[in-house]
Amino acid sequence: MKIWVDADSCPVRIRQITAKAGERLKLPVIFAANREIPVPKGASMVVTENTEQAADLYITENSVEGDLAITRDIPLAKLLVDKGLYVINDRGTIFTRDNINTYLSARNFMYELQANGLAPEKTNSFGKKEIQKFSNLLDSLLAKALKQRHLDSRF
């Protein structure tokens, strides 16, 4: 299992928590972005071409079923969920086959509103509550994934 991070807009504290979890569980953590981003010790940084969606494409092409991805990008999350990855965002939301289409529809609707000048003001704060929610979800998801991998290897 590898942990993939869409690093273009990933907050520093989330990068730190993710790298620490990877180190603790001896899992590779790969940050991908179209520019150099400082990453914590022990993690890898892949700098892709400086083109739109290049980091997303890299993660999609190199990840495998059972890996974990962290991204805010809903279309990327959809691709990865469909591929069989565990996918979460930096606020502690998990994307699944059951809910990803709802998130994608909401995202597309908000883009339509924005294009027509009707979008509400963004009030998304990012603080201790969101960091704690992310950290808790990351820990529980990694434990679940590793337990499943252990069970699968016994048969």
UniProtKB/Swiss-Prot annotation:
Lineage: superkingdom: Bacteria
A Pfam family hit: DUF188
UniProt-listed CDD domains: PIN_YqxD-like (cd18720)
Family of the protein in this entry: Belongs to the UPF0178 family.
Name of the protein: UPF0178 protein TDE_2151
